[in-house]
């Protein structure tokens, strides 16, 4: 079904619905927007109607007025318009599917290859490494939770900051790039909870840990299978070999299917009839530096010696996925090795820094969860032991205003009960963390405030560990 001269209702203007509604209106559709959560400012709703002709409502609208609905995969199926649509047999497209149809119909993109990356973990790291690798031979635009960047010869240039990774943000990323006359050979999009189906190469980093969406009526892993189920014939899928659900879905796909072994997944979890196409093996070298050995179908293609100064083991999924993708897209081995050996970690993703002369292990990012916080603490404790450091000052929590899926206070409470005594002091960030209790804890309203408090508390031999869920 095309999206031209239709009567459409776009549900959820909070999580990426606004750019979808604007684009559909510009394409000649009669568009209404529904502010499902009632969070959009009335002035903005008025602007959408006055400037773009998009009628907006905070209440459900009659489904019979529309040819089809467009709703996000995370919307509760008990929402009245969705209930009515099912009873009337009305078509409901996901935000991902709608964006895919818009992109496929855009002639400006006909000569540009698209890479889409989804998953639970390692999306941003995989996307960033791949952008660096591709940029050694091609012009690249990268859109991730870190921002919209143009990459050339290994150097990123910021185009725009502040976009989310909802599918609707892809439309803004494309417009902002082309407005500045940046016409890449590759667009790389990090996408939350699924894919649009327009990719020349689709990458699934991980499906675990899984979690409920749509008021816990479905699983995020099922939504992410859009990457596989909507893949274009002739395109390529690069899948985590431990994602059994995705491999099963790919059996009937007309796309080329490749797999990589997730270094964090033990062999017992692999249920493949065939061995993974790509495998990464690691070897500890002098001064605890890691050497990577990259194998394709059992044959070693290259090795790379990694830089110190960050927790390289935390990036192993990204290393193998990005390297495999780069090979598939025509990047030479020399460029891939160069990127891996020059890499020093991404800000907020287990990168080591200094804060006023004190070691800072930075693990604050949009994908941070309680398991990530545990692994970061394990790393900090090992560093403390090996380097004979002092105490650990932990900053833990969320900047809820920026991230939709926050850090559950119950999980934080359990974490502190289990590990709290291993830290001299814990600074809890975010309003919801005030419900969490610990003897050695204090509270901060934001990550910058938490870092300031930690800096004041820490001695020169201490370690500050920052694990806050936020956009960076």
Swiss-Prot record:
It catalyses: 15,17(3)-seco-F430-17(3)-acid + ATP = coenzyme F430 + ADP + phosphate. Gene3D superfamilies: Mur-like, catalytic domain. The keyword Ligase applies. This is Coenzyme F(430) synthetase. It comes from the Archaea. It comes from Methanosarcina acetivorans (strain ATCC 35395 / DSM 2834 / JCM 12185 / C2A). One of its GO terms (molecular function) is ATP binding. Belongs to the MurCDEF family. Transmembrane segments: none annotated.
């Amino acid at each position: 079904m095309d999206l031209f001269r239709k009567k459409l209702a776009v549900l959820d203007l909070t999580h990426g619905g606004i750019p979808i509604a604007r684009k559909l209106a510009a394409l000649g559709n009669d568009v209404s927007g529904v502010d499902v959560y009632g969070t959009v400012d009335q002035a903005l709703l008025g602007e959408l109607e006055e400037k773009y002709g998009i009628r907006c409502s905070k209440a459900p609208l009659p489904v019979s007025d529309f040819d089809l609905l467009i709703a996000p995969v995370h919307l509760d199926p008990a929402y009245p318009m969705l209930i009515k649509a099912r009873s009337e047999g009305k078509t409901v497209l996901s935000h991902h599917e709608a964006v895919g149809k818009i992109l496929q119909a855009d002639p400006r993109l006909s000569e540009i290859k698209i890479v889409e990356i989804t998953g639970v973990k390692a999306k941003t790291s995989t996307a960033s490494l791949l952008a660096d690798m591709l940029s050694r031979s091609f012009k690249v635009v990268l859109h991730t939770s870190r921002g919209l960047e143009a990459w050339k010869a290994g150097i990123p240039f910021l185009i725009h900051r502040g976009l989310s990774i909802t599918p609707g943000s892809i439309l803004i990323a494309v417009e902002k790039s082309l407005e500045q006359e940046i016409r890449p050979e590759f667009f790389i999009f990090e996408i939350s909870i699924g894919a649009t189906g327009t990719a020349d190469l689709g990458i699934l980093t991980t499906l675990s840990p899984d979690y409920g969406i749509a008021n816990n009526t479905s699983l995020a892993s099922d939504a992410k299978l859009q990457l596989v189920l909507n893949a274009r014939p002739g395109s390529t899928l690069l899948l985590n070999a431990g994602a059994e659900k995705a491999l099963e879905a790919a059996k009937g796909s007309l796309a080329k299917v490749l797999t990589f072994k997730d270094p964090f997944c033990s062999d017992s979890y692999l249920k493949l009839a065939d061995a993974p196409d790509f495998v990464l093996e690691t070897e500890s070298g002098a001064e605890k530096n890691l050497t990577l050995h990259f194998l394709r179908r059992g044959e070693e293609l290259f090795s790379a010696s990694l830089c110190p100064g960050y927790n390289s083991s935390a990036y192993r999924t990204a290393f193998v996925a990005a390297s495999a993708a780069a090979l598939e897209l025509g990047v030479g081995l020399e460029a891939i090795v160069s990127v891996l050996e020059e890499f020093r970690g991404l800000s907020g993703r287990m990168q080591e820094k200094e804060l006023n002369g004190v070691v800072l292990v930075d693990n604050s990012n949009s994908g941070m969860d309680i398991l990530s916080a545990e692994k970061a603490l394990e790393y900090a404790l090992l560093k403390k032991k090996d380097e004979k450091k002092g105490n650990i000052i932990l900053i833990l929590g969320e900047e809820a205003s920026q991230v939709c899926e926050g850090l559950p206070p119950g999980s934080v409470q359990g974490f502190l009960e289990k590990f709290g005594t291993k830290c001299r002091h814990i600074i809890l960030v975010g309003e919801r963390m005030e419900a969490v209790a610990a003897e050695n804890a204090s509270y901060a309203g934001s990550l910058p405030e938490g870092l300031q408090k930690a800096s004041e508390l820490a001695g020169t031999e201490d370690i500050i560990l920052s694990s806050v869920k936020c956009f960076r």
